[in-house]
């Protein structure tokens, strides 16, 4: 989950936009282990990791507490080493969205919305309008990876965050339901939220390709949209 209070040295989105060396350093951490200098692959990985780190604690909070923390760029910072900290996301202020029945609905930091669909869509809108847009614009500008492709990758991470949160907490069906709601936001952060089944468990099939298969000896991911259903089922069965 996200922590409250930003430790010294942690980075917000605007820190990345203000300094190309800082952005490059964080991209290098995000793409550690990727044996390639192809900027389109590295950019895709970076956008995915940044979105995943932000969306995961937010999705878990919506799922478990029916509260959405404010993950706008102005209110959030990330550990410069990303996974180097077990809780790599920090919030500056405790602002949140909640439902009318929440005991803290009257708190000055609370914004009350009608239902959990509104919470899921508020996360989509915050990521789209108040966090990712200038970052994706910047990364697309130097990476030769198209904006639409990067937005698909970001949307996949939003959907995947809800699916994984549901699996991790024993609420798989609810996680899938919220994933579909979150994916129904306005373009460019809009997707199918395709969720197949294998052995009774959800398998999120991405809308966009992460390009991992273009690495030396890189296979298609299990949730790759380029992988046909029979091959996906075979690999899942082999790994069961």
Write out the residue ranges for each language-model feature.
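Cys/His-clustered metal-coordination modules, chiefly Zn-binding fingers
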Residues: 167-170, 174-240
